[in-house]
Amino acid sequence: ITKDDFVLEIGPGIGTMTQYLAEAAREVAAVEIDKTLLPILDDTLKDWDNVTVINNDILKVDIRQLALEKNQGLPIKVVATKYIYVSPA
């Protein structure tokens, strides 16, 4: 991940890895389904102005549209932790 990259993080949890991504990337969109984690994420990421937290199910996010808006439609980097739970469609 470089300063030129737009990164989509699936399931940031409390934002620990998100901080490292924000340091390395141009911009990070972190999609978190659990709204109870939003206050923690807001606090953890308050010093990072290149992070957008999206409270949604990743299966409901239009990733193509996000890439178009945030990265001119160019390929994006996707990061997720191995313990992520993706709800069935």
Where do the language-model regions lie?
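Catalytic cores of RNA-modifying enzymes
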Residues: I1-A89
